[in-house]
């Protein structure tokens, strides 16, 4: 049940004339079982016999109080509870004019008017198993507003038969948001907007549209002579918020009631404009949210971007200038000239938080100047005209502008309260920066936010991610316009376009840039493709947050693993910082893999850089199922034709190898086929294979119909093979690899090293190799997609002595023996939560042996391992 559903249901109970079932109905709202409530009403579960009182074990002790005697009633039941050593969670008394309640666990009290009870629905959330502290952390008051606002949106869409996105409705909602905020923050007179609707419109909502149309005209009028008397108290707003004519809408009793409740039940002064993004998420369709990237980003996460990008430096400048009024004045001038640009601004979260931080810095500078000089005349420095953005979605674009106006008003109030004799009027509104409604990939950023090389400009944001497989036709067209001539450019995520344009913009304007991104731009196959292009613009990475979980406070938020990458023009004077969790490390250079090291890029290769045998795909049947047998089919076949046993081999693919299971295949050459071709089963199965190949539209497959008794590929081992799954879960510490004998044929869904030395399996199952795979492998969803070109052929291995190889071989054989002893599938054995401790220890022993081949000093982290591997890769590829 949504939050506002709880509130609304309690409002229904409170507004009834008959309150004889008040407690039972209240308990029902919080999902106390109906059977329990029925027995309670009958007295079966009421643990007290006192008249007018109800005691439900562990839940509540309730008492109806005499008029005006709430405290006496509460003291009375408190004494009863203490005397009986009872443990009800809540004590609750009411005379139906007021409500007094106490939470016996937290000792928190509630003392409100009876009609106000719905607003405090969260007080009794423990009945639903939700602690209030937890609730307040997860569901701020802003979300309550978002849900209530979303309900208005849904009802109006239904009442007006609106299916597609509608500009008129969207604009109406933006204006409605402003009016709610204005009446609670003294831009309008208190409650004037809601009272206007309550007193001058019919209950059925029939004349509500006309009222809104008239009001919006007045709010856009500077001349007030012909304004109707009942609207004269509403001021001229400007900012073009009300300039566009109001679109006629149908209203009903229901939508009118929801609008009034939105004004009466919410204190809009407490609602942060940066949460308006969550309102957009609440009203926008799931599809729009996913594709257009209308992210609501929490303040702590925004600070991770803007602090290292510019805010830390500005704060340090303030401290450095603290006792020097000339330096303070220079800093004041400087912060009034900086430009801030979010080219995927959504509903404006990053711009709003940045604006507020700059205004607070302005306030602190003015206060300090007044302390130093006695008097200091306030002249506005930071203005909305310094803020720029691009947003593709109309609705979010309009909310971004509205949110900036609201943020401006809030900061004007803060200024008035903090600085003596400083006043900055909100109305009439001024242009809210330059927020363009456009596709950021199709416009020149220098046209949106023009800047000379000498100007201070910061670009930041949380652009849409969208992997290549999730991109629609428009997205693919956008990407083609940028990366069409780049080899493998089609593999890049959509966010790569923002990195490209950010680098291009920085190269011509000297801007500093920072984006939140999925970690695809810093690990895996996309790294070399993207950063080869970015480095052409002469940029460097200035700071970065390595992978962390990014969540927001918006409704039903989903966490994703992201990185933050800050970059700008080449500058040896810039201190470069790597952030890992809560630690901050000063480094000489940050590579595209977010390591402390040179800008090395790992590209796919056709041959191994180390002295390694070739990694093959397994064997593709391309047989229409004719040559493959399930265990049951195989058993039936050899029971009926025992003479066929020598012509079968085990057949394993990636799924069977990791999760267990087995199939069989007919493994024939021409000579073997000639011996058994008259067998009815063989004839049937070969016929299936031949028909499949003949009907194929692929000419190569058609040729295979000439030899329908054999696989397309016919690799086999004389001894044993190293088996490498092509896909493995990202959650595993190691990719489960192993050995297969000559009696097993491996499918094309698995990689194979035929007749390899066993020590090589130890190398490939080491943490060093796993670190490499994490950094350079492609992804299938979030799982690692192993490949010969990127993972195996590029893996740098130092020269190994015979002794080292023998040590590695002994360690991997010990692991194989342990796996045999433990039993179970590889998926079970390598599940990180259930991996046997003996197996973990054996792997750690192997890791140590392999790592000492790279250096004698013990590695402290995977970051260190990757730094060493990248350096060795560079050395080996430059030889």
UniProtKB/Swiss-Prot annotation:
Family annotation (SUPFAM superfamilies): S-adenosyl-L-methionine-dependent methyltransferases
Transmembrane region(s): none
Entry's EC annotation: 2.1.1.72
Disruption-associated phenotype: Decreased promoter activity for promoters with the target sequence very close to the -35 SigA-binding box (scpA, hbs, rnhC, yumC and zapA).
UniProt-recorded Gene Ontology molecular function terms: DNA binding; site-specific DNA-methyltransferase (adenine-specific) activity
Gene3D superfamilies noted in UniProt: Vaccinia Virus protein VP39
Enzyme class of the recorded protein, top EC level: transferase
Keywords: DNA-binding, Methyltransferase, Transcription, Transcription regulation, Transferase
UniProt KW Nucleotide-binding keyword: no
Entry's Gene Ontology BP terms: methylation
The reaction(s) this protein catalyses: a 2'-deoxyadenosine in DNA + S-adenosyl-L-methionine = an N(6)-methyl-2'-deoxyadenosine in DNA + S-adenosyl-L-homocysteine + H(+)
Further comment: The sites are enriched on the left chromosomal arm.
Role noted for this protein: One studied mechanism is via transcriptional repressor ScoC (also called hpr) which binds to non-methylated scpA promoter; when the m6A target is methylated ScoC no longer binds and scpA transcription is up-regulated. Other mechanisms for gene expression regulation probably exist. Binds DNA with and without the target sequence.
Family: Belongs to the methyltransferase superfamily.
Protein name per Swiss-Prot or TrEMBL: DNA methyltransferase A
């Amino acid at each position: 049940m949504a939050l506002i559903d709880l509130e609304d249901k309690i409002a229904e109970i409170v507004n009834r004339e008959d309150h004889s079932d008040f407690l039972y109905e209240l308990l029902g709202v919080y999902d106390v079982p109906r059977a329990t409530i029925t027995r309670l009403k009958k007295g079966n579960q009421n643990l007290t016999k006192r008249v007018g009182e109800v005691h439900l074990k562990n839940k509540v002790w309730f008492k109806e109080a005499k008029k005006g005697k709430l405290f006496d009633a509460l003291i009375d039941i408190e004494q009863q509870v203490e005397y009986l050593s009872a443990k009800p969670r809540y004590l609750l008394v009411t005379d139906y004019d007021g409500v007094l309640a106490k939470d016996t666990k937290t000792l928190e009290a509630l003392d409100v008017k009876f009609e106000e009870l719905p607003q405090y629905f969260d007080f009794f959330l423990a009945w639903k198993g939700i602690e209030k502290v937890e609730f307040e952390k997860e569901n701020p008051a802003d979300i309550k507003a978002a849900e209530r606002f979303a309900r208005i949106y849904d009802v109006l869409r239904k009442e007006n038969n609106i299916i597609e996105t509608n500009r008129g409705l969207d604009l109406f909602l933006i204006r409605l948001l402003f009016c709610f905020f204005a009446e609670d923050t003294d831009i309008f007179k208190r409650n004037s907007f809601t009272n206007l609707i309550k007193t001058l419109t019919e209950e059925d909502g029939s004349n509500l549209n006309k009222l809104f149309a008239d009001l919006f005209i007045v709010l856009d009028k500077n001349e007030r002579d012909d304004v109707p008397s009942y609207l004269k108290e509403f001021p001229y707003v400007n900012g073009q918020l009300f300039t566009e004519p109001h679109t006629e809408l149908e209203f009903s009793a229901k939508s009118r009631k929801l609008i009034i409740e939105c004004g009466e039940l919410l204190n809009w002064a407490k609602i942060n404009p940066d949460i308006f993004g969550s309102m957009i998420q609440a009203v926008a369709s799931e599809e729009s949210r996913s594709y257009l990237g209308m992210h609501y980003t929490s303040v702590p996460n925004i600070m991770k971007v803007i602090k290292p990008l510019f805010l830390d430096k500005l704060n340090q400048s303030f401290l450095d200038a603290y006792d020097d009024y000339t330096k303070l004045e220079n800093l004041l001038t400087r912060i009034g000239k900086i430009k801030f640009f979010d080219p995927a601004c959504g509903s404006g979260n990053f711009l709003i938080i940045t604006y507020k931080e700059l205004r607070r810095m302005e306030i602190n500078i003015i206060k300090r100047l007044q302390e130093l000089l006695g008097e200091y005349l306030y002249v506005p420095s930071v203005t909305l005209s310094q803020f720029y953005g691009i947003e593709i979605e109309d609705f979010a674009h309009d909310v971004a502008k509205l949110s900036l106006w609201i943020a401006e008003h809030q900061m004007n109030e803060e200024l008035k309260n903090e600085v003596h004799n400083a006043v900055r009027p909100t109305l009439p509104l001024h242009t809210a920066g330059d927020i363009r409604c456009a596709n950021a990939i199709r416009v020149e950023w220098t046209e949106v936010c023009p800047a000379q090389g000498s100007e201070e400009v910061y670009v930041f944001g949380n652009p849409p991610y969208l992997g290549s497989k999730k991109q629609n036709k428009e997205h693919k067209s956008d990407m083609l316009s940028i990366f069409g001539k780049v080899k493998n450019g089609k593999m890049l995520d959509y966010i790569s376009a923002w990195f490209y344009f950010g680098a291009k913009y920085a190269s011509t304007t000297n801007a500093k840039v920072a984006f939140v991104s999925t970690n695809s731009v810093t690990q895996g196959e996309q790294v070399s493709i993207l950063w080869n292009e970015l480095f052409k613009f002469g940029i460097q990475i200035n700071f970065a947050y390595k992978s962390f979980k990014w969540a927001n406070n918006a409704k039903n938020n989903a966490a994703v693993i992201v990185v933050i990458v800050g970059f700008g023009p080449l500058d040896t004077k810039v201190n470069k910082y790597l952030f890992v969790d809560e630690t901050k490390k000063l480094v000489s250079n940050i590579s595209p893999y977010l390591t402390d090291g040179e800008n090395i890029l790992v590209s796919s290769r056709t041959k191994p850089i180390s002295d390694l045998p070739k990694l093959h795909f397994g064997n593709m049947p391309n047989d229409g199922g004719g040559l493959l047998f399930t265990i049951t089919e195989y058993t039936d076949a050899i029971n009926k034709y025992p003479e066929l046993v020598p012509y079968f081999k085990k057949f394993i693919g990636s799924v069977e190898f990791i999760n267990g299971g087995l199939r069989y295949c007919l493994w024939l050459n021409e000579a073997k086929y000639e011996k058994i071709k008259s067998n009815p089963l063989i004839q049937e199965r070969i016929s299936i294979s031949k028909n499949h190949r003949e009907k194929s539209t692929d000419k190569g497959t058609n040729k295979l119909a000439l030899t329908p008794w054999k696989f397309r590929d016919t690799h086999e081992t004389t001894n044993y093979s190293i088996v490498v799954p092509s896909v493995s879960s990202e959650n595993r510490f190691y990719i489960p690899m192993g050995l297969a004998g000559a009696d097993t044929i491996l499918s094309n869904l698995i990689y194979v090293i035929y007749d390899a030395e066993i020590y090589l399996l130890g190398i490939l199952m080491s943490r060093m190799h796993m670190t490499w795979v994490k950094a350079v492998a492609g992804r299938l969803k979030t799982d690692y997609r192993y490949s010969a070109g990127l993972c195996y052929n590029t893996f740098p291995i130092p020269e190994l002595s015979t002794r080292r190889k023998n040590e590695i071989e002994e360690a991997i054989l010990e692991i194989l023996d342990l796996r045999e002893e433990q039993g179970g599938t590889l998926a079970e054995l390598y599940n990180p939560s259930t991996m046997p401790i003996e197996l973990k220890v054996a792997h750690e022993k192997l890791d140590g042996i392999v790592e000492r081949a790279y250096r004698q000093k013990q590695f402290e982290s995977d970051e260190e391992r990757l730094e060493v591997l990248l350096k060795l890769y560079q050395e080996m590829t430059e030889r």
